[in-house]
Structure formats: C-alpha cells, structure tokens
Design a protein with these regions (language model features):
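Short aromatic/hydrophobic "clamp" motif used to bind/position activated sugar donors
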Residues: 78
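Non-catalytic, C-terminal membrane-associated alpha-helical segments of glycosyltransferases
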Residues: 209, 226-289
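Glycine-rich, basic loop-to-helix element that forms the pyrophosphate-binding segment
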Residues: 55-73
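A recurrent flexible, glycine/aromatic-enriched loop bordering the glycosyltransferase active site
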Residues: 115, 132-150, 172, 202
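A short, conserved alpha-helix in the catalytic core of glycosyltransferases
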Residues: 142-150, 154-159, 164-192
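N-proximal low-complexity "stem/linker" segments adjacent to membrane-targeting elements
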Residues: 1-24
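Conserved donor NDP-sugar-binding/catalytic core segment of glycosyltransferases
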Residues: 90-121
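Short, acidic, metal-binding catalytic loop of nucleotide-sugar glycosyltransferases
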Residues: 23-32
Length: 289
C-alpha cells in the first residue's frame, strides 16, 4: 500500500479540532500513514497512541514548522494538514494516491475546500484565476496550503516550504517550484476537505507579511526582467483595495512590508526558467500578477 507521511502543524489552541483532524487521517483506508503532530511553540499533549509528536520551543512560523515535521515521517508522498481541517472521506488519501499514480506528471495536489457549516467557500480557495465552478479540476497556479499532497521527491526538489516567510504566500512559492521542476500542480475539485471559512486579516501582521512576502516571492523565483512587474501589479491592486477611508493603518503596514522585503534579500534565489513562466501563463496566471 502507498505510504503517506502526514504532518499536522498546531499551536495547541484548538484541541478539539486537532483531535478531529488526526482522527480523520486515522480513518483513512487502503493506505499506510505515518503521522507527526508538530507543536509550534507548544508541547503536544493528549495525542492518540501511534502518532508521533515534535515540540518546537518557539513558534517558528507556518512554513518552517511544516518543514520541521518532514524528517519525522516516512512515505513517498507527503500530506500537510492544518489542525482545523478534516477529511470527510475515508478514501481521501487513497484517491490522492491513485491520482498521482495515474498522472505521473502531477507533483502536487490541492483538494476542494468545503466549509462544513455550509458557508460559501471564498474564491481564494480555488487556486486559479476565475474560480467559477469550484468542482472543476485543473492546473493550479496558487495554493490553499491547509491540505497539501505532494510527492516527497518534488518537495525536496523545491527546497521545501520557504521557512523565512513565516506566514503568507508560502504556497505560491512551493507551486512555482513544482512547475519549475517540470511537474504540474493540480487542483482536484472532486476530492474534498473540510475547513471553516476564516477571515485571513485576523492576523495582526497580515498586511505587512503579504507585502514583504510578495517581494520575496519575486526575488526568490522570478527572472529579473519580470520581477518588478509582479511586485508593481500587486502593489497597485492592493492600494486600490485599501483606498477606502479607515484603511490608513493597513496601507501603512503594507508599505512597511514592501520596504522590508526590498531591504532584506531572501535566501535561495533560484529564478524560474522562462519555459516555466510560459507554462504558468498557459495555465491562466502569468507570473506578473
């Protein structure tokens, strides 16, 4: 049977949801799972027997926390699950394994995300422009990271999640690097995961990190000729969105993030091939916006 290395990242603030997430993985059939719960600044407690734990002394951020869990698990396929997500189908991982087996060109898969209470899923959960029909599968150019399936060799080839990002846009970085290895990132609209609709701006550092990491995305991954267009287009779009009265603080935080990203170069600059930029354009989102 296919073995999945499963990494569940948590800060320990949602014990009921965490247990539901773990249990939903434990109920998967026709696959083997090796599970680790990574406590990001928290010592995991009350974890089911047979599930590994890793306690990080401090909160090192979402992407770095996920990376820390990878060496703890075996499996040729990795599965990253948020602590407030849940698998409603006991064949979720089996279906993912079959998709990867039948489509060797696919390196990463994001499932369709459903709010279990019936709230309308936001368009940002569909990793392509013109979200439209959320049930339609196809190539992914961005990523909702809360239930990510990826081949281990592809993950390692990408250098893992960009740990220094801490929060925001780490999924785009990973998706770009999947494409740059010659693989396809895929949205499986027929395979579902449950996750509540949550306002991303609840994080106090949201706007600063959005801006800083946009700059770092460009500096890490884009050819020098198009990097300024990517940063410029997103800056213009964001400033228009934040132009309404009452957003003065948010605009200031965004500009602070831009300055931070420009002043502090990220690690591991690996400009994507021009052929990758073309593939992303053919998939619906050229890396200039």
């Amino acid at each position: 049977m296919t073995q999945f290395g499963v990494v569940v990242l948590t800060m320990g603030s949602r014990p009921l949801e965490l247990r539901a997430a773990i249990d939903s993985v434990g109920k998967q059939v026709n696959v083997d799972t090796d599970i680790v719960v990574v406590g990001n600044g928290w010592v995991p407690t009350d974890i089911p027997t047979g599930v590994k734990t890793l306690a990080l002394r401090e909160n090192i951020g979402i992407p770095a926390g996920r990376n820390a869990g990878v060496p703890e698990v075996d499996g040729e396929i990795l599965f990253f699950l948020d602590d407030d997500a849940e698998l409603p189908d006991p064949r979720f991982l089996e279906r993912m394994a079959k998709l990867l087996s039948s489509r060797p060109e696919i390196g990463l898969i994001q499932p369709r995300v459903i709010d279990p209470t019936g709230k309308h899923a936001p368009g940002r959960w569909v990793p392509r422009p013109r979200a439209g029909d959320h049930a339609r599968s196809g190539p992914a150019t961005t990523l909702w990271e809360g239930a990510t399936v990826i081949r281990r060799n592809v993950f390692e080839g990408a250098g893992g999640w960009p740990g220094e990002f801490f929060y925001a846009h780490e999924g785009i970085d990973l998706v770009w690097r999947v494409w740059d290895q010659g693989y396809v990132a895929w949205y499986a609209g027929d395979i579902e995961v449950n996750h509540p609709v949550i306002n991303p701006t609840r994080h106090s550092e949201f706007h600063r990190m959005q801006a800083r990491n946009r700059v770092w995305l460009a500096r890490r991954n884009l050819p020098a000729a198009i990097a300024p267009f990517y940063v410029g287009s997103w800056t213009a779009l964001t400033m228009v969105k934040l132009a309404k009265p009452g957003n003065t603080e948010a605009r200031g935080a965004y500009l602070d993030g831009l300055r931070e990203g420009m002043a502090n170069p990220p690690s591991d600059r690996t400009p994507m091939k021009w052929s990758t930029a073309w593939q992303l354009a053919r998939a619906g989102r050229p890396p200039i916006y």
